[in-house]
Amino acid sequence: MAITKEDVLEFISNLSVLELSELVKEFEEKFGVSAAPVMVAGAAVAGAAGGAAEEKTEFDIVLQDGGDKKINVIKVVRALTGLGLKEAKDAVEQTPSVLKEGVSKAEAEEAKKQLEEAGAKVELK
């Protein structure tokens, strides 16, 4: 029985955030491509003129170190991401790991605060 596009889409839709991130990295390595968005030339010219005054609106939450209180950090990671226990534990132990991508500044700062209170070291990119 051949695998259809719908089968692939259904499989991907059931992946966790961490598993999906790993899948994207494997695609990038295997096919020599980048998942970075392509910028249109016209937008680049317009963006260059006002780019210095613009404030960054989307952030990635990167866990740099789980700290000494890993259990507390795992609990916060699970609450923030919706990951299962094993995925959250792996994310905390295999640092640096991207917990969330493209979130608002307020959400990123709140997540950073919660993670740091639990004992983690976090970077917003």
UniProtKB/Swiss-Prot annotation:
Lineage per the UniProt record: Bacteria, Pseudomonadati, Campylobacterota, Epsilonproteobacteria, Campylobacterales
GO molecular function terms noted in the UniProt entry: mRNA binding; structural constituent of ribosome
Subunit structure, interactors included: Homodimer. Part of the ribosomal stalk of the 50S ribosomal subunit. Forms a multimeric L10(L12)X complex, where L10 forms an elongated spine to which 2 to 4 L12 dimers bind in a sequential fashion. Binds GTP-bound translation factors.
Pfam families per the UniProt record, alphabetical: Ribosomal_L12, Ribosomal_L12_N
Protein name: Large ribosomal subunit protein bL12
Family that this chain belongs to: Belongs to the bacterial ribosomal protein bL12 family.
One Gene Ontology term, aspect cellular component: cytosolic large ribosomal subunit
Function: Forms part of the ribosomal stalk which helps the ribosome interact with GTP-bound translation factors. Is thus essential for accurate translation.
